[in-house]
């Protein structure tokens, strides 16, 4: 062999060795599709960076995919194209959709077990675990940003309107009267607004007031569900909102979280919104207060049901990716991470240890209202009306509701007509989706 040939072979061997070594030590990339915006998007990026910096084997890559419904639809499309991410954040309404796609997902309990971690559901808050588990108790998804709807109010606007800024309204009639006073006094352009008329004013309204949303325990007992949201209490509530909308005392912001901007801008004095919206409200520097979700005397308060979203794992991934997912979920479960996530975002800690650590630190003593979402959810044992809502097509049913609510708020129909149409259209859609 000539010296020249030997030189070529040594160079080739060296290059091959470098290629193999580089690939052997390359971090396994794990895509995490999510729907977080604003302050909560910053939290996502921070968590990914902290996990990536803590080890060298795996790299979490967060990818923003739009609103909650847009992210779910993107995930479904990616699965059909055989290119899904390893992890996808799915909002509460999409849980039934994911549970119905058994072959598409890998239960998080299995991911953790195969990754070498013992999953003990007793370490997690019971109400949250139950919402994301099969009837046999198998945990299907990882509860990332669980939330509860609460009332926010602008203390400065309350003072201008002659309202007691230290005592937010507790019942819905009190909210409506306060909203009227804010409007008529000129303290703000609008008295009251709400995000998520479906999740807050319908699903949680039913649970918090202990009235039925639908048959079969709101879908938790089976897929054959008949909606019950045209019952008298719903009609009374939505007619009150429709009446307030006529002169702008109630202002509609949109189907999801858009109304939060009406509150943060000072346009509206009262807002019902997810506890997870706290981060953005804090960033405005406004003088805000927090109260529990309002209720009707003689009905509530019972308990709220979790909102927010959980992290689902798609099937068909490599062992290395699943190991990385298990490591990431273990990282997220750490008490210090959960405590911090709760304190900076307003989302609820998913583990009992994180809740107890936050309580022990004195955080709630300094910020008593921040415990409100947890106390609402854990205050009473759930009834068949308040365990949750699980429909195979809940996003579709929410769309139907939003269409009818928007027609109602535009003055095209009253609350009774809107709710009757929701039941008629919703029942037909559920029957078709469930194959009954």
Curated annotation (Swiss-Prot):
Quote the Pfam families the UniProt record gives: SBP_bac_8
Gene Ontology cellular-component terms for this entry are: periplasmic space
Annotated keywords = Periplasm, Signal, Transport
Q: Which residues bind sn-glycerol 3-phosphate?
A: 68, 92, 147, 274, 308, 347, 398
Give compartment(s).
Periplasm
Q: Which first-to-last residue range defines the signal peptide?
A: 1-26
Glycoprotein as UniProt keyword: no
SUPFAM superfamilies assigned to the protein according to its UniProt record, in alphabetical order: Periplasmic binding protein-like II
InterPro entries in the record, alphabetically?
Answer: Bact_solute-bd_prot1, SBP
List where this protein forms a coiled coil.
none
- Could you tell me what this protein does? Part of the ABC transporter complex UgpBAEC involved in sn-glycerol-3-phosphate (G3P) import. Binds G3P.
List, alphabetically, the PANTHER family matched. Answer: ARABINOSE-BINDING PROTEIN-RELATED, SN-GLYCEROL-3-PHOSPHATE-BINDING PERIPLASMIC PROTEIN UGPB
Family assignment from sequence similarity: Belongs to the bacterial solute-binding protein 1 family.
Q: How does it assemble?
A: The complex is composed of two ATP-binding proteins (UgpC), two transmembrane proteins (UgpA and UgpE) and a solute-binding protein (UgpB).
Q: What is this protein called?
A: sn-glycerol-3-phosphate-binding periplasmic protein UgpB
The organism is Agrobacterium fabrum (strain C58 / ATCC 33970) (Agrobacterium tumefaciens (strain C58))
Primary gene name: ugpB
């Amino acid at each position: 062999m000539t010296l020249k040939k030997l030189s070529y072979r040594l160079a080739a061997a060296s290059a091959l060795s470098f290629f193999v070594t580089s690939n052997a030590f390359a971090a396994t990339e794990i895509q995490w599709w999510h729907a977080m915006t604003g302050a909560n998007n910053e939290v996502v990026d921070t968590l990914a960076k902290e996990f990536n910096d803590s080890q060298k084997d795996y790299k979490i890559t967060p990818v923003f995919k739009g609103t909650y419904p847009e992210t779910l639809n993107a995930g479904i499309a990616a699965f059909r194209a055989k290119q899904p991410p390893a992890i996808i954040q799915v909002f509460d309404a999409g849980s039934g959709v994911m549970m119905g796609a058994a072959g598409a997902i890998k239960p998080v309990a299995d991911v953790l077990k195969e990754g070498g971690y013992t999953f003990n559901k007793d370490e997690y808050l019971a109400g949250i675990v139950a919402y994301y588990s099969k009837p046999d108790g198998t945990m299907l998804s990882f509860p990332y940003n669980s939330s509860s709807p609460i009332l926010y109010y602008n203390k400065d606007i309350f003072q201008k309107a002659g309202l007691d800024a230290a005592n937010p309204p507790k019942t819905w009639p009190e909210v409506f009267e306060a909203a009227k006073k804010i409007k008529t006094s000129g303290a703000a352009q609008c008295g009251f607004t709400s995000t998520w008329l479906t999740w807050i004013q319908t699903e949680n309204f039913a649970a918090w007031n202990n009235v039925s949303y639908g048959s079969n325990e709101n879908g938790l007992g089976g897929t054959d569900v008949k909606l019950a949201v045209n019952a008298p209490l719903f009609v009374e509530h939505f007619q009150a909102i429709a009446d307030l909308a006529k002169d702008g005392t109630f202002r509609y912001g949109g189907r999801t979280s858009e109304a939060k901007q009406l509150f943060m801008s000072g346009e509206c004095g009262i807002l019902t919104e997810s506890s997870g919206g706290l981060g953005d409200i804090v960033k405005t520097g406004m003088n805000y207060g927090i109260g529990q979700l309002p209720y009707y005397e003689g009905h509530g308060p019972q308990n709220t049901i979790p909102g927010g979203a959980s992290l689902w794992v798609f099937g068909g991934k490599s062992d290395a990716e699943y190991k990385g997912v298990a490591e990431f979920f273990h990282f997220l479960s750490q008490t210090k991470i959960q405590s911090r996530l709760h304190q900076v975002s307003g989302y609820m800690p998913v583990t009992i240890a994180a809740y107890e650590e936050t309580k022990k630190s004195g955080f709630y003593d300094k910020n008593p209202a921040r415990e409100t979402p947890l106390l609402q959810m854990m205050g009473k044992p759930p009834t068949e009306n308040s365990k949750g809502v699980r429909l195979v097509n809940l996003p579709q049913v929410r769309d139907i509701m939003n269409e009818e609510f928007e027609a109602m708020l535009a003055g095209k129909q009253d609350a009774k007509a809107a709710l009757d149409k929701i039941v008629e259209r919703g029942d037909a859609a559920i029957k078709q989706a469930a194959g009954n």
